[in-house]
Amino acid sequence: MAHQFDVVDSEIVLEAPIIAVRRDQVRMPGGNVSAREIVEHFGAVAVVAADEDNRLYLLNQWRQAAGQRLVELPAGLLDVADEDPLEAAKRELVEEAGLEAESWSLLTDMFSSP
């Protein structure tokens, strides 16, 4: 049996250029109401770029949230109006790595942490 979670109230508690935070009041299966904070985000793309020897191209970038430089895939926000995710991935690969790919395949479409 699937549980029902009804939103009984919702408010935006933070609006910023690339995120918003929404607080929903959710009626749980037992009847209690509980607050749930949801980060609303444009979404993002990441590119696994491999050369002819199957070596991956990685970047070393400062990430303020981590307080350090991280090794990561070329990636970026879906922040251009009406831009297809594949076009965003192509744009980010050029912007961040100076590369253009010969072929493209979708590996996954997912929530990183809903």
Task: Locate predicted features.
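A short, polar/charged loop/turn motif at coil->beta-strand junctions and beta-hairpin connectors
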Residues: M1-A2, E15-A20, G67
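A short, amphipathic edge element
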Residues: M1-E11
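Conserved Nudix-box catalytic region and its N-terminal flanking loop in Nudix hydrolases
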Residues: A2, R36-R91, E95
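Hydrophobic residues on conserved beta-strands that form the core of alpha/beta folds
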Residues: V7, V21-R23, A35, L59, ...
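Acidic, metal-coordinating catalytic segment for phosphate/diphosphate chemistry
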Residues: D9-A46, E52
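Residue-level detector of high-confidence beta-strand sites
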Residues: S10, L59-Q61, D109
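Active-site segment of metal-dependent pyrophosphate-handling enzymes
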Residues: A20, F42-G43, R63, E72, ...
